[in-house]
């Protein structure tokens, strides 16, 4: 639409579910891959090889720590919650607090081995990374590259980003990195205020609900909020 048809919208209304409110942004996301090399050998003498799965086990623990740790000096790996602190994110911490902290989780694991009786010579994982305001794909890749276990294994580890190149139903292929940036519209933006004013005029200041169950979940919540998951808004902003 943008590259070929040259359509440049002034604003876009996403029809993703909002739980009866008006959502004005959400975190970005990217898909990271970590590959580890080892040396295969027969399982009867594992000391002759170099088990890639064991190396990856160390990396997995560090990825978990990156997501779960606090941001103080008591830990070697400062957690992603640090981006809510103006000390680490002076220009964007307020937006980060609205959108929520970034997260990472291991979503897939792969390996190669000659058989069930051999030492694995490679192991790889996929990491689902959700990004808050102030984070970039470069900073997220560097966080993984700087993990103690990744540094420990040096050239045996490769950190990269996935690519999308799946053909559409027309056969068209738009190869693109698996990176979709964080986006946020200020509540004071004219198009956001127009939606708020329209909602107030039609239904009042509360979120919409159809029954008591929905009312219990929505009553008293801010009318304007954000999505927790990633919507197609990442390809629009």
Task: Annotate the PLM regions.
Residues 10, 17-19:
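Short, glycine/charge-rich beta-strand/loop segments that flank catalytic centers
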Residues 17, 24, 31-237:
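Metal-dependent amide/peptide-bond hydrolase catalytic core
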Residues 1-12:
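Contiguous, small/hydrophobic- and glycine-enriched helical/loop subdomains that border
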């Amino acid at each position: 639409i943008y590259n070929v048809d040259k359509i440049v919208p002034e604003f876009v209304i996403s029809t993703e579910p909002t739980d009866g409110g008006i959502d004005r942004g959400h975190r970005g996301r990217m898909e990271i891959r970590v590959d580890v090399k080892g040396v295969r050998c027969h399982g009867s003498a594992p000391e002759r090889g170099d088990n890639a799965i064991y190396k990856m086990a160390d990396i997995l623990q560090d990825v978990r720590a990156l997501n779960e740790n606090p941001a103080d000096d008591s830990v070697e790996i400062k957690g992603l919650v640090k981006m809510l602190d103006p000390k680490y994110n002076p220009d964007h911490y307020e937006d980060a607090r609205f959108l929520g902290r970034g997260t990472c989780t291991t979503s897939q694991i792969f390996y190669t081995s000659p058989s069930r009786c051999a030492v694995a010579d490679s192991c790889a994982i996929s990491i689902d990374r959700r990004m808050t305001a102030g984070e970039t794909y470069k900073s997220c890749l560097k966080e993984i590259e700087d993990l103690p276990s990744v540094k420990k294994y040096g050239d045996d580890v490769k950190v990269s980003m996935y690519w999308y190149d799946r053909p559409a139903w027309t056969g068209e292929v738009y190869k693109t990195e698996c990176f979709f940036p964080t986006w946020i519209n200020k509540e004071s933006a004219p198009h956001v205020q127009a939606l708020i004013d329209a909602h107030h005029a039609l239904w009042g200041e509360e979120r919409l609900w159809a029954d008591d169950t929905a009312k219990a979940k929505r009553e008293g919540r801010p009318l304007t909020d954000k999505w927790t998951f990633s919507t197609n808004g990442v390809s629009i902003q």
